[in-house]
Amino acid sequence: MFACDAVDLDFLSTAPTRLGATVKVGRPPSEVFAAFAHDPANWGEFFPGFDRTGCYDTPGPHGVGSRCTKRVTGIKVEETVLAWDEGARFAFRVDGTTAPAFHAWVEDYHFEPDGSDGTLLRVAIGSKPRLAFKLAAPVLPRGLAFVLSRAGRSLEHGRWFSTPTSNQRHLGQIAPW
């Protein structure tokens, strides 16, 4: 495991690499927030590259300080929740990965009503990349916009829906679906 720096939300304003994107999602903020925060396995439904083995490693109820593990393109990613404002904000930092992609990483999601029963989803990402990730820098802004738009469409079509859960599967346990 490659450890990452234990940064906080302030890192978003000082990170060497900063990305941002906004997408409209035709679901209420409470539902979009639930898709992102309540069950890490959901990410496999709406983000390309993620599988459905994501799980919280800490007991519920989940919130600031909760830890989870996800897998993206076969890489294990361990995270700590930095912000949890039900229906409005969800943020986390990466604590470690099985690939040396970056020294630090923070993601911050804001879920705002769009005035028509939908959500304006804003994401900010701050990172301190290692060499391999630096090489991908030119495509990251368009890649983030594409991935977030695709996630929004998947959410609109209900490809994730779960209810708040205390997802306590252990790492390596296969999800029942």
Residues of each region from the PLM?
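Beta-strand/loop substructures that line and gate deep hydrophobic ligand-binding cavities in soluble
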Residues: S13, G96-S149
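Generic structural detector for well-ordered beta-strands
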Residues: T22-G26, T80, H110-E112
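Glycine-rich portal/gate segments that line the openings of hydrophobic small-molecule binding cavities
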Residues: K24, G54-P100, L120, R153-S162, ...
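Hydrophobic ligand-binding cavity/cleft-lining segments
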Residues: M1-T58, P176-W177
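Short acidic, gly/pro-rich beta-turn/loop elements at beta-sheet edges
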Residues: E31-F33, E78-T80, F102, L131-F133
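A conserved amphipathic terminal alpha-helix motif
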Residues: F2, G126-W177
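Short loop segments at secondary-structure junctions
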Residues: R27-P29, D85, D114-S116
